[in-house]
Amino acid sequence: MGHKIHPTGLRLGITQEHRSRWYASSKTYPSLLQEDDRIRKFIHKKYGSAGISDVLIARKADQLEVELKTARPGVLVGRQGSGIEDLRAGIQKTVGDKSRQVRINVVEVERVDGDAFLLAEYIAQQLEKRVAFRRTIRMAVQRAQRAGVLGLKIQVSGRLNGAEIARTEWTREGRVPLHTLRADIDYATKVGKTTYGVLGIKVWVFKGEVLNEQSQTMPVGANPRRRASRRPQQFEDRSNEG
């Protein structure tokens, strides 16, 4: 079953956390869930060039907190935080309540080439440029290995290289233990739109095993001194605080 079920859903509460963190009654739950979906679609559509890998949404009373994990935080923040104000206004317009308090936190992705969504996005961009899929997959694997991941699996489905008959091709490097619940598996899907039709892209990234809440195995090739020398950027929005 580990190969069939969604890797993130299987590990919720173990190595993965919920993308939406809030509670609601049975009457308001559907509308809030649809609201989260609209917010995510708006952010990915308008800020697709910022390399946003994840959008975490939390709700506290009448306040909405949105955390963005991105490869290029400068694109979102803008000059003197002007991008944050535009993003807040866009979210308020999307939810249909301009008086809603929206707090935005922008967190830089520490290892871009070790993120499953950003790797899938890179593969989709290359395939849309009509680069051969085997070359694209090989380049993605090399980038992930340089980032120090323990294992990687990539699957591409569709009319590969414009073939008449659609097929599925996949490759795996290193370990990807999908049956191990304590394994930190980063999973993402992406659709590449080509002149021959759409291509489905799936990426599994194995980052290590979480032994307990305090310690986690470091990926092979990771240098702790080098990682400590440059901390990932984090921009916390405090404009709504009195």
From Swiss-Prot:
Stretches assigned to coiled coil: none
InterPro entries according to UniProt: KH_dom, KH_dom-like_a/b, KH_dom_type_2, KH_sf_prok-type, Ribosomal_S3_C_sf, Ribosomal_uS3_bac-typ, Ribosomal_uS3_C, Ribosomal_uS3_CS
SMART domains the UniProt entry points to: KH
GO molecular function: mRNA binding; rRNA binding; structural constituent of ribosome
UniProt entry tagged with the keyword rRNA-binding: yes
Region (Disordered): 216-242
UniProt superkingdom: Bacteria
Assembly and binders: Part of the 30S ribosomal subunit. Forms a tight complex with proteins S10 and S14.
The family this protein is said to belong to: Belongs to the universal ribosomal protein uS3 family.
Record's protein name: Small ribosomal subunit protein uS3
